[in-house]
């Protein structure tokens, strides 16, 4: 497991649903990986392969929406998506450096993430994305971000053409898929 203090939380996150070691290897080491695949059961062997590759590179690795498996496999942490509203897990079962991060789209979901004890809240979508016509825009993003004292990460629709607009939002960092898929961006 990578060691980092809460003050050294990652600022850049790449969501993956498949594993391409060559692609991940080309990313800057400061980019953390969130493995998110809701279509099939998680394959522990695959997750351990991703973990090993991330460890070799000094990269943080989070598993989406499976807290028990992330703890069992001694990962850096878990990502709780906005639809995960469970607050009945026992935080004392976590290792000292285990980090919970999660996403929200509204003030109500931000409050749930606060109750879950997340260290970072991913607010999304910042910009228009293919799967949804609703998006925050920088003004709405900043209004939502002001509703919490937890550090926020910008997520959704970030690409080369709107990347400079990230300067308009008050975020600790950003996360994405398409931005990191295009290797020319990094």
What label would you give each PLM region?
Residues 10-16, 31-35, 61-63, 78-80, ...:
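Hydrophobic faces of well-ordered beta-strands that scaffold small-molecule active sites
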Residues 21-31, 110-123:
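Alpha/beta enzyme core
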Residues 1-23:
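N-terminal amphipathic alpha-helix/helix-capping segment at the start of soluble metabolic enzymes
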Residues 81-89, 120-135, 158-186:
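Glycine-rich phosphate-binding active-site loops on the catalytic face of alpha/beta enzymes
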Residues 46-62, 85, 90-106, 134-157:
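Alpha-helix-loop-beta-strand connector modules within alpha/beta enzyme cores
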Residues 3, 21, 27-93:
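N-terminal active-site wall of soluble small-molecule enzyme domains
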Residues 27-30, 73, 116, 147, ...:
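Structural motif
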Residues 14, 33, 70, 113, ...:
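Conserved, mostly hydrophobic/aromatic
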């Amino acid at each position: 497991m990578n060691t980092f203090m809460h003050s050294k939380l990652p600022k850049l996150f790449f969501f993956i649903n498949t594993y391409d070691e060559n692609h991940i290897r080309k990313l800057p080491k400061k980019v953390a990986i969130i493995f998110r695949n809701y279509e099939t059961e998680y394959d522990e062997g695959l997750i351990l392969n991703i973990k090993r590759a991330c460890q070799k590179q000094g990269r943080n690795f989070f598993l989406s929406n499976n807290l028990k498996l992330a703890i069992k496999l001694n990962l850096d942490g878990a990502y709780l998506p906005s639809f995960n509203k469970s607050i009945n897990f026992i935080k004392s079962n976590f290792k000292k450096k285990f980090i919970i991060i999660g996403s929200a789209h509204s003030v109500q979901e931000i409050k749930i993430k606060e109750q879950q004890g997340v260290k970072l809240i991913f607010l999304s979508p910042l910009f228009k994305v293919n799967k949804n016509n609703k998006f925050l825009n920088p003004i709405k993003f900043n209004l939502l971000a002001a509703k919490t004292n937890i550090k926020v990460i910008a997520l959704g629709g970030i690409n080369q053409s709107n990347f400079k607009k990230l300067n308009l939002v008050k975020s600790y960092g950003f996360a994405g898929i398409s931005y990191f898929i295009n290797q020319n961006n990094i």
